[in-house]
Amino acid sequence: MAVDRGMTAPNIVLVYADDLGYGDVKCCNPASKIPTPNLDRLAAQGVVFADAHTPAAICGPSRYGLLTGRYPWRNDRGIELGHAYDQCKIEEGRLTLAAMLGGIGYHCAEMGKWGLRYDYRSALRDPATPLDEIGPESFDYSRPILGPNIRGFDYSLTAVMFAIPDPQNPARTIKSKWMMENGRAADGEDVDPANFDWYAFLPRITERAVEYIEAQAGSRDEPAFGIERQQPFFLYFDPHVPHLPLVPNAPFRGTSEAGEYGDYVVELDDSIGRLMQALEDNGLAENTIFMVSSDNGPESVCYEQIRTYGHYSMGDLRGVKRDNWEGGSRVPFLVRWPGLAPAGTRNETPIGLIGMMATLAEYFGIELDSESGVDSHSFLAQMRNPEQVCPEMPPVVYHTPKGDLALRWNGWVYIDAPSGMCSHEPEWFR
């Protein structure tokens, strides 16, 4: 099936933030001490899903589930991401959102974290190098280090992970990153992960995403994007924010009442606002589905923000990232879909973001085969009629990095473990 755009097939922007808590966003938690005017504006123009859950309470597995419609605990996929130089966690041949949309004529771009590893082996000088002996010097950078581009995306600007010696203790390694465009060093420089500029990361991918929108609108010529014809686009924007390290840039420091963490969320909100503005400036807003969510709940440093600032990143929920308590998997989910989702509405039905593939497949009339999106259940009906509670939605399953499972269905939560805790919950908080 091919989509004839004719300005009718909608563009899709999907923002998947990193460790953004349900309680960080004003439209989800009015008591938040962080101003999020752009997210609030998006909510006013669309639907707030008040009970949306990620496929896992941890970064990589959550992204695997979102992009494949398959639970990451199947085949132990992504319960732990493993070694820094493991191969791409999405299996070769597994249908992804990008591959599905590309199959009906979409141009697909990813900009941000990725978080699902890469085809490192193809770029090694010696493909037989043992994992623990691989370092940045092991690669032939004339060969691309690919991840998104071999899983359905036409373009990527991503922070590729590298393991490097810890400057404080050279006997151990730490993880760092380097910007790669379509698998190659983005600046044409020597790759030097020890000097990765975290402050430049969010501004850089934001600027590039704006340029991508301009190129899709025909107001910019950019060969690197590989846009060969006018076609609808899918932009998967997955910034490493507000994940540690907390690096808000100078204009955003002091703009919240929740310290550096809150200021970093304000910068994220500004970044999202710039994408929204670029769509409006280029006449694309009314033909673009715009969705914002997060890969899991907030990092456990949020407990110190409670003590210091009185800001609850998990809102009134218990649990944080990695936990099977709801604060680990319940996340903001905002959808603006002109002509389909009623503006200023709210849906209370428990849904799983693993349903993204089935939702878009239903809208486009795509029939998924028995091996694709096996755990994905459409929530298109909830988008069209958000104030209708649908008890027939199937249970949502999610898990901790340990592999402990939890199930959310209607008003119930079942945790298949002695406790929902995986991160450390301080005694004073209980």
PLM feature segments, named:
Residues 1-429:
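Formylglycine-dependent sulfatase
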